[in-house]
């Protein structure tokens, strides 16, 4: 076969990473496997198959066989812009089944069910590791069966085909015309089903269900997918530690704020929101169940970074389950210590032990954390001041070693990250109070001389804010600030936050992936990914269409 078109050669991101790993392992493990691809019309079966051929072409020859439309039309619709495969990889059995991209000696003039297996054997003999996709298998069977007076049924032919594939180490994809269960599922080695539906607000939800894959352990049977840009892509899991940076990874380049908007700090999200968050607005970040304890940082960290990089003040009341020192460690790795110490104010409070500090839960139901590497240790849960103590000790140590306090400056390690002597902490007895908080941020405003960002976990700040949300929203609007209110599953605080919020976003888990979507404004489902090609990992969003 001709060499792949270099313009469309699959990269790691375009191929194996975005193609389900379990399916790749299914084909690259034991040779001779046959995969049945089920799904109703419009679910993306053909695009899934083409993506698979792109992946498998890297270690062998591939052939896409159809009877639906001619070679040129198939190539124009599915291959030309989105695949490394050219027309020679496409075969229309209804036109000329012997017009092959290989030098094949076929000892018969007409292709039928009785000669199909021999035809495949001749192709295999002229190729290296071979993959053939039949799309759709039912239509190809019917076309070939029409040439016989007394043809065997499709189950018999499929059994013979699968047996040949195992014997000759041929990889097969059989695309079905239906999503319904069929006897073919018991014959083949693997079965996947593509599904599509709309939620109550009209959002498209697409999934790939891994029914069975011989020889492969399936940890997550239902995987979110998208057909964005006319290509099949699996929306892959995100490990939250990769969202954050390590020491000396790079310097955050500030994104531009406009007179009407604050940048979200996420390049893919700003255009969806017509430039970012409105000035003077309240954003509700609604966390779904079974998210790791640091999931709140996915949407908020980029905004915090961008405010600080623009030398604007930030006040953060993080969730009490959050990793100790998360903000301090992240922000000091992408911004100068002076910027963090001057403009960022983090209030760690203690509001009682959580039943499971490693995850968000709903109505008493405890879920397994997505990111077990970030789960709190038993000592964290047992210490009544675990989060505060660990963070403050780290801050105190780093300040004393790198930035000694100026004469007369007080470092209040028990209540907030850094507090000058002229600022009185709003945290008393481990609890945040509303009026002292407002007085504190007014002093911060004088120092930064501009709008402020408030990031407040409502679960942590409940006693201070639950009866004052209306007043707080008015304050934010009056001063052209930005506030992000974070709520956890199954609490009344969700409804209260919604009543004052100008925008409402929800972060939820789908399979092992993390999805973001807007309830107000209404947005599509957006899969969260990470671009690690830059010194600072960047959030990327993939629309589910």
From Swiss-Prot:
Amino-acid positions noted as binding ATP in the UniProt annotation, renumbered to this chain: 39-46
Compartment(s) where it occurs, according to its Swiss-Prot or TrEMBL record: Cytoplasm
Chain segments carrying region Basic region 1: 201-209
GO CC annotations on file: cytoplasm
Region annotation (P-loop) ranges: 36-46
Sorted UniProt keywords: ATP-binding, Cytoplasm, Nucleotide-binding
Region (Required for interaction with GvpE): 318-362
UniProt xrefs under InterPro entries: GvpD_bR2, GvpD_P-loop, P-loop_NTPase
Transmembrane segments: none
Protein family: Belongs to the gas vesicle GvpD family.
Quaternary structure and partners: Interacts with GvpE, also with c-GvpE from H.salinarum.
Remarks, miscellaneous: Encoded in a 14-gene locus called mc-vac.
Protein name in UniProt: Protein GvpD
Organism whose genome encodes this protein: Haloferax mediterranei (strain ATCC 33500 / DSM 1411 / JCM 8866 / NBRC 14739 / NCIMB 2177 / R-4) (Halobacterium mediterranei)
């Amino acid at each position: 076969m001709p060499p792949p078109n270099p313009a469309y050669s699959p990269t790691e991101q375009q191929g194996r990473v975005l193609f389900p790993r379990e399916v790749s392992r299914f084909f690259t493990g034991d040779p001779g496997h046959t995969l049945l691809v089920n799904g109703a019309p419009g679910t993306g079966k053909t695009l899934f198959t083409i993506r698979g051929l792109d992946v498998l072409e890297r270690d062998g020859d591939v052939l896409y066989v159809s009877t639906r439309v001619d070679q040129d039309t198939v190539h124009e619709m599915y291959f030309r812009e989105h695949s490394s495969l050219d027309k020679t990889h496409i075969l229309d059995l209804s036109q000329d089944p012997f017009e092959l991209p290989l030098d094949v000696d076929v000892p018969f003039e007409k292709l039928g069910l009785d000669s199909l297996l021999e035809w495949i054997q001749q192709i295999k003999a002229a190729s290296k590791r071979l993959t053939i996709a039949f799309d759709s298998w039912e239509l190809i069977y019917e076309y070939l069966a029409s040439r016989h007076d007394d043809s065997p049924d499709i189950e018999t032919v499929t059994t013979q085909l699968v047996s040949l594939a195992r014997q000759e180490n041929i990889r097969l994809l059989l695309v079905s015309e239906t999503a319904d269960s069929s006897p073919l599922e018991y014959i083949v080695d693997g079965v996947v089903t593509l599904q599509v539906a709309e939620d109550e607000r009209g959002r498209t939800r697409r999934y790939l269900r891994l029914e069975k894959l011989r020889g492969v352990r399936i940890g997550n049977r239902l995987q979110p997918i998208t057909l964005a840009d006319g290509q099949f892509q699996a929306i892959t899991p995100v490990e939250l530690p990769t969202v954050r940076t390590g020491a000396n990874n790079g310097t955050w380049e500030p994104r531009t704020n406009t007179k009407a908007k604050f940048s979200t700090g996420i390049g893919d999200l700003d255009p969806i929101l017509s430039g970012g968050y409105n000035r003077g607005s309240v954003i509700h970040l609604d966390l779904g169940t079974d998210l790791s304890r640091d999931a709140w940082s996915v949407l908020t960290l980029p905004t915090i970074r961008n405010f600080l990089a623009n030398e604007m003040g930030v006040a953060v009341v993080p969730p009490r389950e959050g990793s100790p020192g998360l903000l301090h460690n992240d922000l000091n790795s992408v911004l100068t210590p002076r910027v963090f110490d001057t403009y960022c104010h983090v209030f760690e409070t203690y509001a009682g032990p959580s039943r499971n500090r490693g995850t968000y839960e709903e109505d008493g139901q405890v879920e397994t954390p997505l990111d077990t590497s970030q789960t709190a240790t038993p000592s964290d849960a047992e210490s009544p001041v675990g989060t505060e103590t660990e963070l403050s000790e780290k801050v105190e140590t780093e300040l004393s070693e790198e930035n000694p306090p100026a004469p007369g400056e007080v470092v209040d390690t028990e209540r907030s990250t850094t507090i000058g002597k002229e600022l009185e902490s709003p945290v008393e007895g481990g609890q945040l109070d509303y009026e002292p908080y407002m007085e504190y941020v007014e002093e911060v405003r004088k120092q930064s001389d501009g709008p402020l960002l408030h990031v407040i976990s409502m679960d942590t700040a409940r006693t201070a804010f639950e009866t004052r949300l209306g007043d707080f929203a008015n304050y934010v609007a009056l001063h052209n600030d930005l506030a992000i209110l974070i709520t956890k599953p199954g609490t009344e605080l969700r409804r209260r936050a919604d009543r004052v919020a100008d925008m409402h976003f929800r972060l939820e888990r789908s399979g092992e992936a993390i999805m973001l979507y807007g309830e107000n404004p209404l947005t599509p489902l957006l899969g969260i990914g990470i671009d690690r090609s830059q010194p600072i990992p960047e959030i990327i969003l993939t629309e589910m269409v």
